[in-house]
């Protein structure tokens, strides 16, 4: 089966704040690597996913009329399969377009560090989109292997010894961390 024909893929869930709103990122995985990302505002009355659920499956459903939607399926604490139909209804069109672009880059195998750098370099005018961007960066940084080095100089000691530790860029010389 061709990658573009995938109907169901494993997914991780990352929750984040976009301004004052609670948002959710569905990170679809292929071979344990991010393959696509969907984000949306959490609307518990329309789509409740228990806070302890952080894994499941994204299912692409093609309707008879040719339209498509995305569902999310997870196993609850009692072992029952739950399917949330139409998670795509949560996707604001503007954020959806950025997520489609990021997903396209992921599908073509760009290294996660480069994808994160690309997202970091986006200059967006809206404060809402900027806080969304930070949430997406945080979601994807989780997939960068510990010890992955960058060419960045440490803002504290000036050494080129920055590497990822637990999804956070950290100086291996002085211990400075961008995460605080």
Question: What do the predicted segments below correspond to?
Answer:
Residues 26-103, 107-108:
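Function-dense linear segments that define catalytic or interfacial modules
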Residues 154-157, 171-174:
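Short cysteine-rich clusters marking metal-coordination/redox-active sites
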Residues 30-32, 107-113, 144-147, 165, ...:
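Secondary-structure transition/capping motifs at alpha-helix termini
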Residues 113-121, 126-150:
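Long, highly charged low-complexity segments enriched in Glu/Asp and Lys/Arg with interspersed Ser/Thr
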Residues 162-168:
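Short Cys/His-rich "knuckle" micro-motifs
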Residues 160-162, 178:
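Cys/His-rich microdomains that often coordinate metals
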Residues 6-30:
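Structured beta-strand/loop patches that form or line metal/cofactor-binding pockets in enzymes
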Residues 1-3:
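Short, small-residue-biased leader/transition segments that mark boundaries at the very start
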């Amino acid at each position: 089966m061709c990658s573009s024909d995938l109907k169901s893929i494993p997914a991780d869930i990352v929750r984040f704040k976009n301004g004052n709103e609670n948002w959710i990122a569905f990170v679809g995985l292929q071979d344990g690597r991010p393959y696509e990302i969907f984000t949306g505002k959490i609307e518990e009355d329309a789509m409740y996913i228990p806070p302890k659920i952080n894994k499941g499956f994204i299912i692409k459903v093609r309707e008879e009329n040719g339209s498509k939607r995305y569902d999310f399926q997870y196993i609850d604490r009692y072992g029952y399969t739950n399917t949330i139909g139409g998670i795509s209804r949560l996707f604001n069109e503007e954020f959806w377009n950025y997520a489609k672009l990021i997903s396209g880059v992921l599908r073509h195998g760009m290294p996660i560090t480069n994808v994160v750098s690309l997202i970091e370099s986006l200059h967006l005018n809206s404060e809402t989109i900027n806080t969304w961007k930070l949430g997406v960066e945080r979601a994807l940084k989780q997939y960068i292997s510990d010890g992955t080095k960058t060419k960045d100089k440490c803002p504290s000691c000036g050494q080129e010894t920055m590497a990822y530790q637990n999804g956070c860029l950290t100086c291996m010389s002085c211990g400075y961390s961008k995460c605080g």
